[in-house]
Each structure stands twice: as structure tokens, then as C-alpha cells.
């Protein structure tokens, strides 16, 4: 456990317990690897896909830590917004929802898909895997599915849309 994860967990518990204590409808959400238009690739909190996008557009090298087999549960920003709307209108249960697709995708597979979409080969600089990096990440989205939410954006379509936005701006 890291201080970051402990803080996130404590915030979730506070939100849920506050709602129960005062009978206020509250939920907490966990956003997994969100990407999409207007994401700032220069932020220290930026997701890997915004950094890859910037490197592709500016023909700059991308540093890949490890072999690229590490997985993430990527979710497009429009699906995040739709999930938040669904949660806010369909439930009063004080609980935690994971907002993601529920799929594991390796970083190297995402990079290859993106290269295919944009027609540019990413200049990759490989470095040793970082000890603190998570190797596998996949969200349990059963609660989200339980209120009728289903992601609308495939990885390919969302990356295509993201590239279109980023290349025009």
C-alpha cells in the first residue's frame, strides 16, 4: 500500500460513511486509465495515452518502461461521463463504483493499435521496468453493469476519435 492508495481508500470510506450517517445519497467512484480530448499530456498526472499521442504528433521518442506487457483498463472520457450520469440517476446506494471497461489491454497492444490508426511508427526508447509500476490492472465493473451501464467506445474507435481531435488542435 502506498500513501496515495491509502488516501484514496480513506476518502471513499469517508464519503460512503458520511452518506450513511446523514442519510444522504452518496457514491464514490474509481476512475481507471481515462483518456480523451483535452487531456493535458504535459501534466505530471497525465495518463500514458496522452503522452503517446503527443509523442506521435510531435514525432518525439516515447520511453517505455519494461517490455510493454503491463496491462491497464483504459476507458474513454465519453464513457466516463455517461457512467457518471448513469450512477447519479440510477442509484442511491452508498457504495463504490469502478469506472472502466473491465478489460485488460497491454501497453504494447495499445501502441500498435494507435500506430495502425495514425499511420506513424512510434519511436520507442526501452528502459528497465520500474519497481513501483503496477504490472496488471483490470477493474471489476460488475456493480456498474448492475445498474445497466455498458461502455459505448471500443479502443480502436476511441483512439481514432482522440487522434482526430488532437491532430486538429
How would you label these PLM feature ranges?
Residues 1-4, 32-46, 66-78, 103:
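Glycine-rich "substrate-gating" loop/helix at the edge of Rossmann-like oxidoreductase active sites
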Residues 1-27, 32, 56-58:
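Active-site Tyr-X1-5-Lys
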